[in-house]
């Protein structure tokens, strides 16, 4: 089961992607196909010891830039590395795609080439957040800035399946992100969504607040892509700021430096917990295949872990489990009664 890696999309492509892919092949034994300019890719591979590693190169002559229109780029740049990578999955040459390129284009390519799963109107980008007791899955974190209640319900069902079969949570607690836990809080979107969620075969616990993402009280947090992207960027900025503040305090006095030396292991463990590279990337849920969206500035470690998680996702057959749960949650023509309306692939407004 090969993983196709878009090696031309990231801020530091193809150097970072190739190094991360080589590490994944060496450490985890994952077969990888590097998709991009064959000459540049082979030049990067020459810098590594690839003897005995299952690494293939697939040529793609075009690149989707970070500022390209997502849907236009996917349709017009038919030989772009990201579209070719998804075409490999469609053709059975790979089981998953990993990309650190334009997130909107990655999402659009996944939907355009592989199409949405039956019962899904909007694919969603999910992200794991560190908590005091493990991890919380938040979705959507940027795939769809405007959502209807039915979309959030679909996100909840997909997130529940992911938490159960990927995160290993027996009975995942699903919460709807709002400005308070009381039923009277929220807006029209959250109130309508909450009423629908209570009818679904999931462990829905009601409204949760932003702080609950990190305190371990909920396993899956559902929101629209606008709110989710703000939460994601806020958490990234906070983690970076806290790191800088700690460094400044440690350097402020000799006693602080002694204290740091004595507590270095604890600091390193904390750094590892909040390091996005440990999580690799954000899975794109709701397409007929596996897609992993990485941060544009990902380092080799992040790419390596994204490849590992994408491979595990495919091996566990999570999409099949999602299809079963969707059929259970939306029997017959229930989706039509609840106001589902599927747009054309690639037309969603995406938060970058």
Curated annotation (Swiss-Prot):
Transmembrane segments: none
Primary residence: cytoplasm
Annotated Basic and acidic residues bias: 328-339
A Gene Ontology cellular-component term: cytoplasm
GO biological process, one term: phospholipid biosynthetic process
Alphabetic keyword roster: Cytoplasm, Lipid biosynthesis, Lipid metabolism, Phospholipid biosynthesis, Phospholipid metabolism, Transferase
InterPro entries in the record: FA_synthesis (IPR003664), Phospholipid_synth_PlsX-like (IPR012281)
Cellular compartment(s): Cytoplasm
Annotated segments matching region Disordered: 328-352
Molecular function terms from GO: phosphate:acyl-[acyl carrier protein] acyltransferase activity
Enzyme Commission designation: 2.3.1.274
UniProt catalytic activity: a fatty acyl-[ACP] + phosphate = an acyl phosphate + holo-[ACP]
SUPFAM superfamilies xref list: Isocitrate/Isopropylmalate dehydrogenase-like
Organism superkingdom: Bacteria
Gene3D superfamilies: Isopropylmalate Dehydrogenase
Top EC group: transferase
Pathway: Lipid metabolism; phospholipid metabolism
Family designation: Belongs to the PlsX family.
Protein purpose: Catalyzes the reversible formation of acyl-phosphate (acyl-PO(4)) from acyl-[acyl-carrier-protein] (acyl-ACP). This enzyme utilizes acyl-ACP as fatty acyl donor, but not acyl-CoA.
Subunit annotation: Homodimer. Probably interacts with PlsY.
Protein name (Swiss-Prot/TrEMBL): Phosphate acyltransferase
Organism: Geobacter sp. (strain M21)
């Amino acid at each position: 089961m090969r993983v196709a890696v878009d090696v031309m999309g990231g801020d530091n492509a193809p150097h970072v992607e190739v190094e991360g892919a080589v590490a994944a092949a060496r450490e985890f034994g994952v077969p990888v196909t590097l998709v991009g300019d064959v000459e540049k890719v082979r030049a990067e591979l020459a810098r590594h010891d690839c003897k005995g590693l299952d690494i293939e190169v697939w040529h793609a002559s075009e690149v989707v830039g970070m500022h390209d229109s997502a849907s236009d780029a996917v349709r017009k740049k038919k030989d772009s590395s990201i579209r070719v990578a998804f075409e490999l999955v469609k053709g059975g040459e790979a089981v998953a795609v990993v990309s650190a390129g334009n997130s909107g284009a990655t999402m659009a390519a996944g939907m355009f080439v592989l199409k949405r799963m039956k019962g899904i109107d909007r694919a969603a980008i999910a992200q794991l957040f560190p908590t005091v007791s493990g991890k919380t899955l938040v979705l959507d974190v940027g795939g769809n800035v405007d959502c209807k209640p039915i979309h959030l319900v679909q996100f909840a069902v997909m997130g529940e399946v992911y938490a159960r079969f990927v995160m290993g949570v027996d009975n995942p607690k699903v919460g709807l992100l709002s400005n308070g836990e009381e039923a009277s809080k929220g807006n029209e979107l959250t109130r309508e969504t909450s009423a629908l969620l209570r009818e679904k075969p999931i462990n829905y616990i009601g409204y949760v607040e932003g702080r609950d993402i990190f305190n371990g009280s909920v396993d899956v947090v559902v929101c629209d892509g606008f709110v989710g992207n703000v939460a994601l960027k806020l958490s990234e900025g906070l983690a970076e700021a806290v790191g800088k503040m700690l460094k400044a305090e440690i350097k402020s006095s000799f006693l602080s430096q002694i204290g740091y030396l004595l507590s270095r292991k604890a600091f390193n463990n904390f750094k590892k917990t909040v390091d996005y590279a440990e999580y690799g990337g954000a899975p794109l849920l709701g397409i007929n295949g596996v897609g992993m969206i990485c941060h544009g500035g990902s380092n080799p470690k992040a790419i390596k872990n994204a490849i590992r998680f994408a491979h595990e996702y495919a091996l566990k057959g999570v999409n099949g489990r999602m299809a079963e749960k969707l059929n259970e949650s939306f029997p017959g023509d229930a989706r039509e009664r609840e106001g589902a309306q599927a747009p054309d692939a690639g037309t969603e407004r995406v938060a970058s």
